[in-house]
Amino acid sequence: DTLLDTDGEVVRNNGGPYYIIPAFRGNGGGLTLTRVGSETCPRTVVQASSEHSDGLPVVISALPRSLFISTSWRVTIQFVEATCIPKPSFWHIPQDSELEGAVKVGASDERFPLEFRIERVSEDTYKLMHCSSTSDSCRDLGISIDEEGNRRLVVRDENPLLVRFKKANQDSEK
């Protein structure tokens, strides 16, 4: 299965960029970054509180040299407009996170951390998954609201966040 964007076009491997937006409006916007706890830079992946925000654009990359992304492949995800964070700023789940299973950005221990997979749920709806580095098992990512009201992207065994991929056009209003 090939990953498609909201226009029905192929999501390009190491291309785009794309916004990751919720499949259903009403509970927040696209995925973005915020500062949590003692972070000096925004390093925590969250869902924007406003459903009118598409969040920050990402590039999705897979190791096979292909123009497209297959839903069976492990991928890296990185924000392209993340400020004050060392590049490359891959999504990853650090072992020492204050919230278990919370998705963060920053330099990873691995040069190209293939920690995530995107699985089709319906025709143009997908779910994000975090995959173990030691096995083939992957677990859903969903939203958990922390004590500060942040809608954090975390590993969840139920209620995965259902998403779509929207081209980040330079002339876009949002």
Curated annotation (Swiss-Prot):
UniProt entry tagged with the keyword Disulfide bond: yes
Record CDD domains: beta-trefoil_STI_LlTI-like
SMART domains xref list: STI
Assigned keywords, A-Z: Disulfide bond, Protease inhibitor, Secreted, Serine protease inhibitor
Cystine connections: C41-C84, C131-C138
Superkingdom of this protein's organism: Eukaryota
Keyword Nucleotidyltransferase: no
One GO MF term: serine-type endopeptidase inhibitor activity
InterPro entries with a match to the protein in the record: Kunitz_inhibitor_STI-like_sf, Prot_inh_Kunz-lg
GO cellular component, one term: extracellular region
Pfam families, A to Z: Kunitz_legume
UniProt-annotated site: Reactive bond for factor Xa, residues: R65, S66
UniProt-annotated location(s): Secreted
Record-linked PANTHER family: KUNITZ TRYPSIN INHIBITOR 2, TRYPSIN INHIBITOR A
Family: Belongs to the protease inhibitor I3 (leguminous Kunitz-type inhibitor) family.
Role: Inhibits bovine trypsin and chymotrypsin, and human plasmin, plasma kallikrein and factor XIIa.
The protein's name: Trypsin inhibitor BvTI
Lineage, opening ranks: Eukaryota, Viridiplantae, Streptophyta, Embryophyta, Tracheophyta
